[in-house]
Design a protein with these regions (language model features):
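C-terminal membrane-exit region of the final transmembrane helix in multipass inner-membrane proteins
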Residues: 9, 363-403
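Transmembrane alpha-helical interface segments in multi-pass membrane proteins
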Residues: 285, 294-338, 370, 378
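Short, membrane-interfacial amphipathic segments enriched in basic
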Residues: 1-6, 242
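Short helix-loop junctions at transmembrane helix boundaries
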Residues: 325-370
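Hydrophobic, regular-secondary-structure patches
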Residues: 37-116, 143-144
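Hydrophobic alpha-helical transmembrane segments of multi-pass inner-membrane transport and secretion
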Residues: 16-43, 259-294, 317-326, 374-381
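Hydrophobic secondary-structure segments that place a key small or acidic residue at a functional site
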Residues: 102, 113, 117-123, 135-205
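Mechanotransmission and gating elements of multispan inner-membrane complexes involved in transport
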Residues: 172-265, 272
């Protein structure tokens, strides 16, 4: 067996150009496979984390009749005693934090510019606000009655900076419209322009007073130490006239897109591997026909058909190892670089999902192992037919072929 591998190595050395092209095809294939796996994993990882941290949380507690699409602050749709409920939930095992939030629809305007916005009343001290990175100014304090925090894209469109004034109109609990001036205390960025341009944050107490919600809230926003425990924690939350939803319940589209992306990457992998198989088969067939006389001599000297198959598979395996080594290095470098700087896609979004402006590829070790093993096995399988063809050549006909 060792002698066959030595022969295979010499054969590859005698045909350096063909060997290099075959290894290059495999290395390019593996590079693409690794980068695409990292890209789609990074995309779904980012959209999942952003959607959970900014929108749904791991668990939400709502009033039974609350409709998040309407953003109504009518009392019958809101939770009573939200601070007390949030404190009870926060005391449960596995809960990282729980905080009340109030949602209302409104219009922000400055001069002759205006924009529809979602008003979110938050507890300024809650760690749930960490995704709202303040890039200018500061977060309004809990007792601030005229301060507001706005997204960077909204500040740009309304031509506002910290300290400027804007008018905010809100639909109140009584079904009326109220309007008040606010001072821009700070400007935030979450990394998603689509989200940031439609959100303004107020201290919860001010949002309640401004909208006429009293001491009520729209939801209790809950984050866990492990999101996979959402169902177990949700089962432990009970109360009258409330509805408890897990992140899977609230993000069916996100889960579906995640499953679809797995199927999509599988199809792309098959296409790339199919092209690679074609290149390898053609290269190996070319090698067989170019070495017809050599095969005839080996057969005449007593080499069995099985040994010829092993010889060609040994050549294929050595090519695979070389191509895989280069592919692993280039794929890792590519994924690492873009995983650090990101790939800018700009203002994009899908209803029901929050996506950042940049996608950061994320290469997982299990993907590296899976794709590496797959590439090696595919190379051997692609080489088997040419090897089998070589093993079936008759010595006399093979020797006559190049006379």
């Amino acid at each position: 067996m060792l002698n066959l591998f030595k022969m295979a190595l010499r054969n590859l050395g005698r045909h350096r150009r063909r060997s290099a092209l075959s290894a290059l095809a495999l290395s390019i294939s593996l590079t693409l496979l690794l980068f695409m796996a990292a890209f789609f994993k990074g995309e779904m990882r980012s959209s999942m984390e952003d959607t959970l941290r900014l929108s749904s949380g791991h668990i939400q507690v709502r009033a039974t009749d609350y409709d998040p699409d309407k953003l109504s602050v009518a009392w019958e749709y809101l939770l009573e005693n939200p601070q007390q409920t949030a404190a009870q939930i926060a005391s449960l095992d596995l809960v990282k934090f729980a905080t009340p939030r109030l949602f209302a629809s409104g219009i922000a305007s400055s001069g002759d510019q205006s924009s529809g916005v979602q008003i979110i009343g938050v507890d300024p001290a809650s760690p749930a606000n960490e995704p709202y990175v303040v890039i200018s100014g500061s977060f309004p304090a809990a007792d601030d009655r005229d301060g507001i925090l706005i997204g960077a894209p909204l500040a740009e469109s309304l031509q506002l900076k910290v300290g400027d004034s804007l008018n905010l109109l809100v639909n109140t609990a009584e079904g009326n419209v109220d309007e008040q001036p606010f001072s821009v205390r700070g400007i935030f960025s979450t990394g998603s322009s689509t989200y940031d341009k439609g959100i303004v944050l107020l201290p919860l107490a001010k949002a309640q007073a401004f909208s006429g919600a009293g001491e009520r809230a729209s939801i209790i926003f809950v984050m866990l130490n492990d999101r996979e425990q959402a169902a177990a924690v949700a089962a432990a939350i009970s109360g009258a006239n409330i509805k408890v939803l897990t992140w899977q319940d609230m993000n069916e589209l996100l889960v579906l897109v995640n499953d679809f992306s797995n199927a999509y990457i599988t199809i792309l992998n098959l296409i790339i591997l199919g092209v690679t198989v074609t290149v390898i088969v053609n290269t190996m067939l070319m090698a067989v026909f170019e070495r017809t006389r050599e095969i005839g001599i080996l057969t005449a000297l007593g080499m069995k058909g099985r040994q010829i198959i092993v010889l060609f598979l040994a050549e294929a395996s050595l090519l695979a190892l070389g191509g895989i080594a280069v592919g692993l290095l280039s794929g890792w470098l590519l994924a690492s670089y873009f995983g650090s700087v990101g790939i800018y896609f700009g203002d994009i979004g899908i209803s029901g999902m929050i996506m950042g402006d940049r996608i950061y590829p994320y290469l997982m070790f299990e993907d590296v192992i899976k794709l590496t093993v797959t590439a090696f096995i595919v190379t051997l399988l692609a080489s088997y037919y040419p090897a089998r063809l070589a093993s079936r050549m008759e010595p006399v006909e093979a020797l006559r072929a190049e006379k």
